[in-house]
């Protein structure tokens, strides 16, 4: 029995992160100085250096990851996007609003396509044991999941809230309507996030590959919706308290405006200064609480349902909401107090904790290490998209 347990344990590999805060601080300091000196031009190279340091100090089964992206590729991409954006603004300002808004609208509409190409580039530039990752998916499906579906759901939510507001206006008072509609809006946003993120997980999980081996995932949409709704509901008590604290300020400001004494607004702000600052504090605390719960929920749901090479390799995430919450609080508070000087050490501490709670289950030694022979695309869309680094809150 001991031999069996030992064998299973040998097939459970935890990510190991060996990055040091001191070295990362030097990288961040040099990046900051060079970015300031070059008026932001060095920013793409700075991002690559930071990401490369993290990747090369992350190991799986004693093998480090590698990151081969270049600052030049990212710079060209960002420059092209900036040029297109600048041309659209110039057309709008110089009497051609139709052309300007059309160009700007096209730029917004192709963001999902750019995100896919950006993911392809970032995946191809990331490797383990000399084998590169990859990503392929249908452009039509990507546009639907990343752009059309969220937009349609937002429109549907607005229509539902508008219709309900017409009904409740004749039934309840102003306070009841605000609280009730606010609660419905929070729940609706949770449902939209749940549906959208479940589609993103499926798109990303089933489109990724490691060499010749493909990843696969099956996500329960109801579980994703439930997690997102619960995450959004944590906003409600904060919103109630903030509303209670800030309501007298707006009441007095409206009263002064109606009596023609709007100049006395500064005295009202000074009178309620403590409540205003408390509201700001609760607002940022609410953001951190929601971010922690949502990130952990989505990350665990994604990794715990992800597999590689026909389910021979599986993944597991054991991060907790309370663990993420207090770490994010420490990162924000200490970084703010030290004016960002402590951030590199805190960043390494947080990444190390995430690595310790990420396991790969399976016999990695028996996995065939063969690269996918498909070359990286080199078309215009790829050139303009290499600097796009989509953020997914479940990775």
Spans of features found by a protein language model:
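Intrinsically disordered cytosolic tails
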Residues: 2, 232, 247-248, 268, ...
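Transmembrane-helix bundle segments that line or gate the permeation/cavity pathway
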Residues: 2-24, 28-161, 189-201
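Membrane-proximal intrinsically disordered regions of secretory-pathway and membrane-system proteins
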Residues: 10-11, 16, 24, 76, ...
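Loop-to-transmembrane boundary segments
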Residues: 21, 70-83, 136-156, 217-238, ...
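Short hydrophobic membrane-inserting alpha-helices and related fusion/pore-forming segments
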Residues: 33-42, 170-171, 333-342
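Juxtamembrane inter-helical linkers in multi-pass membrane proteins
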Residues: 55-64, 68, 122-139, 202-224, ...
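Membrane-helix interface segments in multi-pass membrane proteins
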Residues: 86-107, 157-189, 239-291, 347, ...
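Hydrophobic alpha-helical transmembrane segments of membrane proteins
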Residues: 111-120, 149-150, 185, 189, ...
């Amino acid at each position: 029995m001991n031999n069996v347990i030992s064998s299973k344990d040998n097939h459970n590999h935890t990510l190991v992160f060996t990055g040091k805060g001191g070295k990362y601080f030097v990288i961040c300091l040099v990046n900051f100085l060079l970015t300031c000196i070059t008026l932001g031009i060095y920013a793409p190279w700075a991002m690559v250096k930071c990401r490369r340091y993290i990747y090369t100090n992350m190991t799986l089964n004693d093998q480090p990851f590698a990151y081969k992206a270049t600052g030049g590729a990212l710079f060209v991409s960002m420059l092209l996007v900036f040029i297109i954006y600048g041309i659209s603004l110039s057309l709008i300002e110089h009497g051609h609003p139709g052309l300007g808004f059309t160009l700007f609208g096209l730029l917004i509409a192709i963001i999902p396509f750019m995100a896919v190409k950006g993911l392809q580039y970032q995946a191809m530039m990331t490797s383990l044991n000399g084998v590169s990752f990859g990503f392929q998916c249908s452009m039509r499906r990507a546009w639907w999941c990343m752009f059309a579906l969220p937009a349609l759901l937002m429109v549907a939510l607005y229509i539902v809230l508008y219709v309900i507001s017409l009904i409740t206006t004749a039934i309840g008072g102003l306070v009841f309507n605000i609280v009730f509609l606010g609660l419905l809006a929070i729940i609706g946003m949770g449902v939209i996030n749940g549906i959208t993120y479940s589609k993103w997980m499926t798109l990303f999980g089933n489109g990724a590959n490691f060499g010749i081996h493909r990843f696969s995932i099956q996500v329960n949409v109801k579980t994703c919706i439930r997690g997102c709704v619960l995450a959004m509901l944590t906003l409600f008590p904060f919103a109630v308290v903030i509303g209670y604290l800030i309501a007298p300020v707006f009441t007095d400001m409206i009263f002064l405006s109606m009596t023609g004494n709007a100049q006395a607004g500064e005295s009202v702000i000074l009178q309620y200064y403590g409540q205003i600052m408390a509201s700001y504090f609760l607002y940022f605390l609410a953001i951190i609480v929601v971010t922690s719960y949502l990130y952990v929920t989505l990350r665990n749901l994604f990794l715990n349902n992800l597999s590689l090479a026909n389910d021979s390799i599986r993944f597991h995430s054991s991060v907790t909401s309370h663990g993420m919450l207090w770490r994010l609080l420490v990162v924000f508070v200490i970084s703010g107090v030290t004016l960002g000087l402590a951030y590199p050490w805190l960043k390494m501490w947080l990444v190390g904790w995430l690595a310790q709670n990420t396991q790969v289950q399976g016999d990695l030694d028996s996995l065939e290490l063969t690269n996918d022979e498909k070359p990286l695309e080199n078309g215009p869309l790829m050139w303009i998209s290499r600097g796009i680094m989509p953020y997914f809150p479940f990775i």
